Amino acid sequence: MLSSVALRYLLVLSLAFLAVVTSSRTQSRFASYELMGTEGTECVTTKTISQICYQCATRHEDSFVQVYQECCKKEMGLREYCEEIYTELPIRSGLWQPNK
C-alpha cells in the first residue's frame, strides 16, 4: 500500500495537472479552491500548488511556511515537475501561471 506521503504527492500532482488544464478559465472558476484553513486542504488547492511549485522549483526552502514544507517534503519528483512550469513567483493572487 502507498504511504501517506506518496498518496499526498500523487494528489498534488493530479491537482497540479487539473490546474494546468483549467488555467484558461476565469478566476471565478477557482473560487472553490480558496484556502480552507487546514493543512490537508491547503495542500490540495490550486492557489497553494502554485506557491509550492514556485518554492520547490527555486529551492527557497528557507522561506517556506509550514504548509509548504509539509506539502513539498523536498520530493525530487515534485521539484522536477515544478521546474518545468514555474520560474518566477506566481501572479493573480497565487493562481498558477505557466512559463511561456
From Swiss-Prot:
Disulfide bonds: none annotated. Expressed by the yellow cells, peptidergic (neuroendocrine) neurons of the central nervous system. It comes from the Eukaryota. The keyword Signal applies. Three disulfide bonds are present. GO terms for molecular function: hormone activity. Keywords: Disulfide bond, Hormone, Signal. The keyword Disulfide bond applies. Residues 1-23 form the signal peptide. Stimulates integumental Na(+) uptake. Controls the activity of sodium pumps in the integument, pericardium, ureter and nephridial gland. This is Sodium-influx-stimulating peptide. It comes from Lymnaea stagnalis (Great pond snail).
